[in-house]
Amino acid sequence: AAGELTLTQLESLREVCEANLACEDMMDAQGIIAAYTAYYGPIPY
């Protein structure tokens, strides 16, 4: 499921992640999927 996200879904994940500085840093290094799941658990889509 995680491989088939739409751009809209990815953008909403980024907005959540960017509110958390540590998540944002991880997103820059490892990508939004890895960062979101590390901080917030499974992606809800």
Curated annotation (Swiss-Prot):
Function: The carboxylated form is one of the main organic components of the bone matrix, which constitutes 1-2% of the total bone protein. The carboxylated form binds strongly to apatite and calcium.
Chain positions found as 4-carboxyglutamate: 11, 15, 18
InterPro entries: GLA-like_dom_SF (IPR035972), GLA_domain (IPR000294), Osteocalcin (IPR039176)
Modification after translation (UniProt): Gamma-carboxyglutamate residues are formed by vitamin K dependent carboxylation by GGCX. These residues are essential for the binding of calcium.
Native organism: Lepomis macrochirus
Homology family: Belongs to the osteocalcin/matrix Gla protein family.
Residue sites binding Ca(2+) 1 per the record: 11
Keyword terms, alphabetized: Biomineralization, Calcium, Disulfide bond, Gamma-carboxyglutamic acid, Hormone, Metal-binding, Secreted
GO annotation terms (biological process): biomineral tissue development; bone development; cellular response to insulin stimulus; glucose homeostasis; negative regulation of bone development; osteoblast differentiation; regulation of cellular response to insulin stimulus; response to vitamin K
Span of domain Gla: 1-41
Ligand binding (Ca(2+) 3): 18, 24
Disulphide bridges, residue numbers: 17-23
Gene Ontology cellular component annotations, sorted alphabetically: extracellular region
Record flagged with keyword Magnesium: no
Residues reported in the UniProt entry to bind Ca(2+) 2: 15, 18
Tissue and organ distribution: Also found in smaller quantities in dentin.
Protein name, entry field: Osteocalcin
Stored PANTHER family: OSTEOCALCIN (PTHR14235:SF0)
Primary localization: secreted
Cellular localisation: Secreted
